Amino acid sequence: MERLDTFLEKIQERAKTYIGYPVATDYDYKELYPFLDYSLNNVGDPFIASNDMQAKEFEREVIEFFSELFKAPAENHWGYVTNGGSEGNLYGLYVAREIYPTGMVYYTESTHYSVQKNIHLLNMESIVIRSQPNGEMDYADFEVTLQMNRHRPVIVMANIGTTMTEAKDSVPIIRDCLKKYAIKSSYIHCDGALAGTYLALLGDDDFNFEHGADSIAISGHKFFGSPISNGVVLVKKSYKERIGRAIPYIGTLDTTIPGSRSGINSMILWYAIQKWGKDGMLQRAQNSLENAAFLRDKLNEI
């Protein structure tokens, strides 16, 4: 069709100078093209079979890869492939609310805009914490606010790479603050959409489950690159089991935010993981940092 041809030419031209938006562009998924002829629907829980036209086997391998990367408990982790980081954050907050219905959500002024929207959708109470100049949480302000609300369960949205400055909140410091004020009922969700994957590969991962995270969300299209936005959310399995319910007509548990989910998205992430491998991803992360430093230095020369 002429209109599609014209639009393709416009996109191809734009792609030549398209920088600054957090998506990778050096990907090739042509081997997956034949699967676009089929409606692969990963409806429901990835670890429970549903219909015959699904790609859950690939989704489960993706979940296991990220569970290992983020050092999730061996026998107590679960997750699914999302439509992106915002959905992953919504899921983390949803689980936290079900565990602590009277909990107060704490997030910084540098937090992604979707979090405030998710809090509104879930009808949760929240407090905004000041950010330091670099975008990281102001822990002194966090402590002051905690003292005023010690009677409430604490739900923290920790940023692992803010949108504008790529700042990272410290989960260990947040945990220390909770311990200092003897707060026993708490939940920390880590928004790793921008930097979570590559920081974990580089070993800068004090936000993982071993360091105190209860759930983590990442974006797939930012670091790996994808023509379709996607992501992954991980949570402790014991928490997920509090919200699952059986749905007879789909033959599986309803444990995800959406019902129908694209099987192709799981295959895209699986393919990227297989193509790059952990060593290849590490090199990719290091190259990205080197390129960013080079660009920064050149811009500073102007």
Model regions and ranges:
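Generic secondary-structure signature for well-ordered alpha-helical cores
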Residues: 67-71, 147-151, 179-183, 238, ...
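N-terminal entrance/gating region of PLP-dependent enzymes' catalytic architecture
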Residues: 1-76
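Amphipathic alpha-helical segments that form well-ordered structural scaffolds
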Residues: 61-65, 91, 118, 268, ...
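Amphipathic, well-packed alpha-helical segments that form the structural scaffold of globular domains
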Residues: 63-67, 71, 94-97, 120, ...
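Active-site C-terminal subdomain of aminotransferase-like
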Residues: 201, 208-302
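Conserved aromatic-histidine-acidic binding/catalytic patches
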Residues: 50-54, 80, 84, 162, ...
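Conserved PLP-enzyme active-site core in the AAT-like
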Residues: 57, 75, 80-243, 264
